[in-house]
């Protein structure tokens, strides 16, 4: 759409150019001596108002001056060509034909005038004026021939240089960047570099019939040339491109045939539109790209059109004419681009077609379920690709890559994990020890191993892990060796707490049920108690080589085991005493129950026993005496396993965190079994009967980790050992010795030199036994409380490593006789002696290579199911009574021999001649040592030795110390104690025993003097080794 408006200025227009899109500048006049004024006018253009063109600013020139002939405008600077009047030129001799104006603050201002030609001819005027777009340079040319083009500075109105053309120049124009200047003559075209002033391009080979009329730059490289024909009508347009001084013709076209001459031409700053006027006063709008006519306005003016100009925005085109009018046209973008209606219609139709195609495809997909089929195909292809083309990062990172494709709905995600996969290295040789501890004690430390397992790897390796734990569980149940023989064990404590009920993620270790194979029946133990859920344990790391450790830590606190006796009523206690004759066999199982391990300290600390320990010994002695005076009924022959299943039960154990465990591969925790009160009484009873038959010294000290077992009244909690000494139990059954042989033996003793003294001692012993039996029930009830209180005392290791200290550990352990009667001393003094054992056989826990002081109990043949029990008493004596007690022990030994023979004779009257095997059982986690001496062999030896005379009793001891044929090494065979086998007299035996006791007492006295400042005490510790009969 094109809108036009006409405005009558009142003077002929010779120059016109836009200052801006809304401001049009025109100039003209009547000339010298004419009543028509010469003016410079600024017109405001606004098609929104009724009056589109309005005279906005105007300057009237001197009436004596000539009319303006041309205008050049850029950046609000105005150069106008206008000659002065004839009179003024004649009088001054100068013609200031170039005048400068500026448009500032919406006002036109005159700046000055200059004469570049130096001509005084009033007929010579300024024909051409052109300014660069940026207003930095301008070019002017006069009507004088040949034409000289002057390059001037429009700011200070100075001339830079001149271009001699030698011809009549018809038109000039600057490129948009102001670097090139093109001008044409009637037959030639030339391009000049404004910077250097040199000619870049010249074209003179045009057709002779061509008449060049106008030239304008489209952009910095292209320009358009308008030409006519000399002898015929027609107008042609040609576009050129200048590249590297070699111009090329882009296009050329004859646009009009009827018009002969072009009067004016201009190109919009955007390079899209060409506006030209013809000799018939018409305006044509043409496309620069196609050189076709967009719009033709015929007969716009009544007279010749002198100027045509396009606004900077390209939306207005203005024409000026000598008819004193100005026409202005508003051109829409549709007009400049041709008919846009068809283009819009075509664009609309194309969009409709695209939409129709999309709708058709969507309908087909829905009808034939193609979207689901496409989804399935894509899923399969992605899965194949994930398998066939693994991640390229595998080779770069060098890691095990696990890829998984997850397709949920419309989302497809690929997860790549580069964590190392779970391998068997978790259970490698370096981690065997750790794994073995974890088998039985699944602590939270397992979480640290499990946290490194990725879920995808765990799912692949869960089966192998479960097989590993199955093997571990089988090893635990089969009680296989973990720490091999002669292996060294160095301990490093590490506290670990765990919950058995905890679930360890992502792999939970297989729970190991603590099932009891042979529960021991007890009237005072509640077998329904469950295993405590919280089991804090002290773990120890095993390493090193096995050897005897002579030095002991200087500051090592040990917890003392609490007593075995609980609170029992008198009726229950009587029942327990009756059942004391029945031997108790305790089968050790790694999963279900544990062994009592005796804990013994050094002899120096053993001597410092409090009065409470003495009272406990008195109570134990009373029980022993009562058991001797009132032996239990005979028990029918049956196997040890049947008796255990029938009569005993065991509590489940809760291990306290305050004790340290001797760690085996299965991680077995020791437990306290049975009714401690009943076992304690029956143990004391059997020891008294056995000691009255013979005294055996087992002098082997094999130190292991101390096992302090603490049992509360409900038997539900136990503390595992910290520094334990293992008891090795030996027993001899003299079951086939009849009463006749014992009577002969008694008569032989009575005929000795001390016959009268022995008879008196025997009578006194019988009386004391009757008295003690009445007190046994009352003393037993208080024993447990006293022993509990005394167990809180902590025991310290002797700081001295002198030979005396080492000797004291292997010397005889004695009771404190300061608070018991002479007869009681006689009985107690006949306790087991000490002998040395090889450490490899005596070691229950290879982690400890110290010697262990043990007792050997002789089991009476009446107690066919009696258990091998050990009661070790480390008792110290005061300095004030030590020497007197030594003499009492020596004198009492003779009394024991006579009294024990009498008691054994009485107790064997109603006994069945049962054959009971005696075993000395040393059970290690790594190996099991059994010393099994046949009861029948002992019976035959006993018949031969006791049938002749009394002195042969010594041979029974020698037979016991002889190594059985089926054993490679016996702990008794290495005894360092000398037994008198040649003397037929029991007096000589007694004297030898007294001498040994005195020597031990002297050594103990020396140690006591050295460590007289010690004030720590320790109670008697009672532990029982779980041996199998």
Swiss-Prot record:
Biased composition (Low complexity): 579-592, 655-672, 800-812, 858-867
A Pfam entry, by short name: WD40
Cytoplasmic-facing ranges: 1-344
Compartments in which it is found: Endoplasmic reticulum membrane; Golgi apparatus membrane
Ranges spanned by the short sequence motif Prevents secretion from ER, renumbered to the chain: 1026-1029
SMART domains noted in UniProt: WD40
InterPro entries associated with the record: Sec12-like, WD40/YVTN_repeat-like_dom_sf, WD40_repeat_dom_sf, WD40_rpt
Membrane topology (UniProt): Single-pass type II membrane protein
Ranges of the WD repeats in the UniProt entry: 257-296, 300-339
Segments of skewed composition (Basic and acidic residues): 613-628, 643-654, 712-722, 783-799
GO molecular function: GTPase activator activity; guanyl-nucleotide exchange factor activity
Biased composition (Polar residues): 593-603, 633-642, 750-762, 771-782, 868-886
Entry annotated with the keyword Methyltransferase: no
Keyword Repeat: yes
Keywords, in A-Z order: Endoplasmic reticulum, ER-Golgi transport, Glycoprotein, Golgi apparatus, GTPase activation, Membrane, Protein transport, Repeat, Signal-anchor, Transmembrane, Transmembrane helix, Transport, WD repeat
Ranges annotated as spanning the membrane: 345-365
Name the UniProt record assigns to this protein: Putative guanine nucleotide-exchange factor SED4
Organism listed in the record: Candida glabrata (strain ATCC 2001 / BCRC 20586 / JCM 3761 / NBRC 0622 / NRRL Y-65 / CBS 138)
């Amino acid at each position: 759409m094109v809108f036009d408006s006409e405005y009558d200025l009142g003077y002929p227009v010779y120059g016109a150019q836009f200052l801006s899109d809304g401001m049009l500048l025109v100039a003209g006049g009547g000339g010298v001596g004419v009543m028509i004024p010469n003016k410079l006018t600024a017109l405001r253009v606004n098609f929104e108002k009724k009056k589109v063109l309005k005279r906005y600013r105007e300057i009237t020139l001197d009436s004596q001056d000539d009319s303006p002939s041309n205008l050049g405008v850029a950046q609000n600077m105005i150069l106008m060509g206008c000659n002065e009047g004839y009179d003024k030129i004649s009088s001054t001799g100068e013609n200031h034909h170039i005048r400068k104006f500026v448009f500032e603050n919406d006002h036109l201002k005159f700046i000055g005038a200059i004469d570049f030609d130096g001509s005084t001819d009033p007929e010579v005027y300024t024909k051409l004026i052109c300014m660069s777009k940026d207003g930095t340079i301008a070019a002017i040319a006069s009507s004088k021939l040949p034409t000289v083009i002057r390059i001037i500075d429009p700011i200070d109105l100075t001339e830079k240089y001149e271009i001699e053309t030698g011809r009549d120049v018809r038109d000039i124009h600057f490129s948009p960047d102001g670097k090139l200047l093109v001008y044409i003559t009637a037959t030639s075209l030339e391009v000049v570099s404004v910077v250097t002033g040199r000619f870049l391009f010249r074209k003179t080979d045009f057709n002779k019939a061509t008449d060049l009329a106008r030239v304008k730059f489209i952009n910095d490289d292209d320009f358009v040339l308008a030409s006519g024909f000399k002898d015929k009508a027609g107008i042609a347009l040609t576009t050129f491109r200048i590249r590297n001084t070699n111009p090329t013709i882009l296009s050329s076209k004859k646009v009009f045939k009827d018009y002969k001459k072009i009067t004016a031409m201009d190109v919009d700053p955007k390079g899209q539109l060409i506006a030209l006027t013809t000799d018939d006063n018409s305006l044509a709008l043409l496309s620069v790209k196609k050189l076709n006519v967009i719009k033709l306005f015929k007969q716009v003016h009544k007279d010749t059109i002198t100027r045509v100009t396009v606004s900077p925005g390209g939306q207005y085109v203005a024409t000026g004419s000598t008819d004193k009018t100005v026409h202005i046209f508003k051109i829409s973008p549709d007009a400049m681009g041709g008919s846009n209606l068809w283009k819009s219609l075509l664009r609309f139709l194309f969009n409709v077609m695209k939409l129709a195609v999309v709708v058709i495809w969507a309908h087909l997909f829905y009808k034939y379920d193609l979207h689901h089929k496409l989804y399935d195909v894509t899923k399969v292809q992605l899965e194949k690709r994930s398998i066939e083309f693994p991640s390229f990062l595998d080779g770069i990172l060098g890691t095990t890559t696990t890829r998984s494709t997850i397709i949920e709905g419309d989302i497809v995600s690929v997860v790549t994990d580069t964590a190392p996969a779970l391998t068997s290295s978790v259970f490698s040789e370096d981690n065997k020890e750790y794994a073995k501890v974890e088998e039985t004690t699944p602590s939270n430390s397992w979480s640290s191993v499990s946290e490194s397992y990725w879920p995808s790897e765990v799912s692949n390796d869960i089966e192998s892990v479960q097989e590993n734990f199955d093997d571990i569980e089988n090893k635990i149940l089969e009680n296989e060796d973990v720490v091999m023989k002669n292996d060294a064990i160095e301990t490093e404590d590490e506290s670990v707490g765990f919950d058995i009920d905890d679930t360890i993620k992502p792999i939970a270790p297989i729970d190991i049920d603590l099932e009891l194979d042979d529960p021991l029946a007890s009237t005072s133990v509640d077998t329904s108690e469950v295993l405590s859920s919280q089991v804090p344990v002290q773990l120890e790391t095993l390493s090193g080589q096995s050897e005897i450790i002579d030095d002991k830590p200087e500051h090592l606190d040990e917890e003392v085991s609490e007593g075995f006796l609980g609170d029992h009523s008198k009726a229950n206690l009587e029942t327990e005493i009756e059942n004391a004759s029945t031997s108790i066999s305790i089968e050790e199982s790694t999963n279900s129950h544990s062994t009592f391990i005796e804990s013994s300290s050094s002899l120096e600390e053993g001597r410092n026993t409090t009065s409470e320990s003495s009272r406990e010994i008195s109570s134990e002695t009373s029980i022993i005496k009562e058991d001797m005076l009132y032996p239990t009924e005979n028990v029918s022959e049956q196997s040890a396993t049947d008796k255990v299943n029938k009569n005993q039960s065991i509590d489940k154990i809760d291990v306290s965190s305050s004790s340290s465990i001797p760690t085996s591969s299965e991680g077995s925790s020791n437990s306290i079994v049975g009714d401690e009160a009943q076992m304690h009484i029956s143990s004391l009873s059997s020891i008294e009967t056995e000691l009255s038959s013979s005294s055996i010294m087992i002098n082997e000290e094999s130190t292991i980790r101390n096992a302090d077992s603490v049992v509360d009244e409900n038997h539900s909690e136990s503390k595992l050992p910290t520094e334990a000494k293992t008891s090795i139990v030996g027993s001899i059954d003299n079951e086939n010795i009849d009463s006749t042989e014992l009577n002969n033996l008694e008569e032989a003793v009575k005929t000795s030199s001390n016959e009268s003294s022995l008879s008196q001692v025997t009578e006194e012993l019988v009386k004391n036994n009757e008295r003690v039996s009445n007190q046994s029930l009352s003393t037993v009830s208080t024993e447990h409380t006293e022993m509990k209180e005394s167990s809180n005392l902590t025991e310290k290791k002797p700081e001295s490593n002198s030979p005396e200290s080492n000797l004291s550990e292997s010397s005889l352990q004695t009771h404190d006789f300061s608070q018991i009667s002479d007869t009681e001393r006689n009985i107690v003094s006949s306790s087991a002696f000490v002998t040395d054992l090889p450490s490899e056989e005596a070691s229950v826990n290879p982690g400890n290579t110290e010697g262990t002081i043990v007792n050997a109990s002789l089991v009476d043949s009446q107690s066919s199911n009696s258990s091998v029990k050990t009661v070790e008493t480390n008792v110290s004596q005061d300095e004030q009574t030590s020497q007197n007690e030594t003499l009492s022990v020596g004198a009492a030994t003779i009394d024991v021999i006579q009294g024990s023979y009498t008691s054994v004779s009485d107790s064997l009257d109603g006994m069945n001649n049962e054959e009971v095997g005696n075993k000395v059982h040393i059970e290690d986690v790594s190996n099991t040592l059994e010393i099994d001496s046949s009861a029948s062999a002992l019976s035959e030896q006993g018949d031969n030795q006791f049938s002749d005379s009394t002195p042969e009793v010594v041979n029974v001891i020698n037979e016991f110390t002889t190594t059985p044929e089926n054993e490679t090494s016996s702990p008794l065979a290495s005894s360092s104690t000398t037994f008198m086998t040649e003397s037929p007299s029991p007096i000589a035996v007694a004297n030898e025993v007294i001498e040994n006791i005195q020597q031990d007492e002297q050594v103990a006295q020396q140690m006591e003097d050295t460590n007289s400042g010690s004030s720590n005490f320790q109670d008697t510790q009672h532990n029982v080794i779980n041996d199998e009969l």
